[in-house]
């Protein structure tokens, strides 16, 4: 088989773009907690000494947005000007308006209800925007995710853990990881390169202290969990030589700039829509979760080794305008039979997705860092494999 390398990256909770995502989702959760039908589209910009939140919201509740912002930044660990940012004293600016009534009328009263015929109440809610969304799954890991992004997220989570628990006390919140895996055909066989960039306190010796600590406490424990040749992998720690200035002081952060980190690490296609700060009436988010659910159940059912699912919507219309499956030649049944089974087993109208995945809950803060997919947490309903039997029955397996 042909050998090739594939690389994915992740970032920690202190990366400026991820701070922005976490703030946007914390605001969303606060609104959904009191008003599950809140319509929320909130964007965050964070830079040296300042956080600006803007967007469109329609809700019956009130939330103290400046307090939410400050609490989230302090929780992440930016609590001192010595670290380059202090959530207690930074400037906060909020510019929130209402959702456009032109958009709202299409969501509240779908095209089917106005121009066609409705067959149940799920036909009444239209998609919150046009667009295309992708979901993916493969059999490389127990979570049915590509291995490079799974490893990269595990390293980022571990990097945050050793900072928080004091194992490596001189680390600071900003950090990135990158993993290059060698494949033999479609099978991951060897860890080639690991890159870890972590913000740290001043005057830390890279060669004698930081690199050995990262290898011992972060990389080796994570790599040991996976059945992968890793005897001679290359480790690059802070390749610039120093990473003292980080977080919003080092780079401005924006909601929605880590969409590949949030999904499959580049292993699958992406429709372009970000997730954080959006309530589930926005199909950018809810349909991406639904297509992951579809893809994972297909692989879990043994109907394909790899599958990518695309769904597309027109704004204000309940039914998708298109559904497409790509199995890369790994399907165990005829592709047209598999597509028919998916349409029979899964209802991809926005209201049905929200119902089936129970998305009107304040669950989104936990999605906003370390990946929206592949983490089998109780609230991540799109990670369930609860339609396996129905899919098998639909294809006669």
From Swiss-Prot:
Protein's cellular compartments: Cytoplasm
Pathway(s): Amino-acid biosynthesis; S-adenosyl-L-methionine biosynthesis; S-adenosyl-L-methionine from L-methionine: step 1/1
Cofactor: Mg(2+); K(+)
Gene3D superfamilies (alphabetical): 3.30.300.10
GO cellular component terms, A-Z: cytoplasm
Keyword NAD belongs to the record: no
Record's cofactor remark: Binds 2 divalent ions per subunit.
Protein residues bound to K(+): 43
Keyword flag Amino-acid biosynthesis: no
Record: residues binding Mg(2+): 17
Keywords (A to Z) from UniProt: ATP-binding, Cytoplasm, Magnesium, Metal-binding, Nucleotide-binding, One-carbon metabolism, Potassium, Transferase
Enzyme Commission number(s): 2.5.1.6
Catalytic activity: L-methionine + ATP + H2O = S-adenosyl-L-methionine + phosphate + diphosphate
InterPro entries associated with the record: ADOMET_SYNTHASE_CS (IPR022631), S-AdoMet_synt_C (IPR022630), S-AdoMet_synt_central (IPR022629), S-AdoMet_synt_N (IPR022628), S-AdoMet_synthetase (IPR002133), S-AdoMet_synthetase_sfam (IPR022636)
Main location, first listed in the record: cytoplasm
Single GO MF annotation: ATP binding
Binding site for L-methionine: 56, 99, 251, 282
Annotated binding of ATP, by residue: 15, 174-176, 242-243, 251, 257-258, 274, 278
GO biological process: one-carbon metabolic process; S-adenosylmethionine biosynthetic process
Family the entry assigns: Belongs to the AdoMet synthase family.
Subunit structure, interactors included: Homotetramer; dimer of dimers.
Purpose of the protein: Catalyzes the formation of S-adenosylmethionine (AdoMet) from methionine and ATP. The overall synthetic reaction is composed of two sequential steps, AdoMet formation and the subsequent tripolyphosphate hydrolysis which occurs prior to release of AdoMet from the enzyme.
Name assigned to this protein: S-adenosylmethionine synthase
Chain's gene name: metK
